[in-house]
């Protein structure tokens, strides 16, 4: 890893590794094989560098919604390691009754803990709020990415979303060290400055509870 990546790792205690999974062009078995190969490469590189405090890495996936996911038998294999948490990326379109039923099945039939990825990205697609409101009444969790929290549009969204009283966690949306860098610290600082320490403390407690 680069010096920058090492510096980032030294500031973290645990990192969730959640590569994208798209059921319309991938098989779970193939995805898991590639993920394991990448994970071994990563851990080998970490072992070859002085990364300071030992870091906990958990494998997972960011699973893009597909019709029928609520009944998918192997879906549990994509949960975050050591948990029953499924990080679910929702459609970038108007949400429908079918989507609601699938999410409900994941919770009630599959007995999974659903964490909806980067919820701020779906807001503009919801011309009707009916299904949006129904989904966020389900016992699930929502993730907000830390990038751009100080921008007006995102601040406005967070303020509105907080009224739904859905438990929140934060994500860095880190994809690389050039264009989509780790930004968790900056995002946390912005969140604290704008919304106060109480919200940040509540988020920390939610994250701790989910990953215990």
Language model segments and positions:
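Single conserved hydrophobic/aromatic residue that forms the stacking wall/gate
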Residues: 1-9
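Short beta-strand segments at enzyme active-site cores
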Residues: 13-20, 58-60
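Short acidic/histidine-rich active-site segments
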Residues: 18-20, 166-182
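Active-site metal-binding loops of divalent metal-dependent hydrolases
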Residues: 20-21, 62-63, 119, 147-148, ...
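Mid-to-C-terminal alpha-helical segments outside catalytic/metal-binding sites
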Residues: 184, 188-212
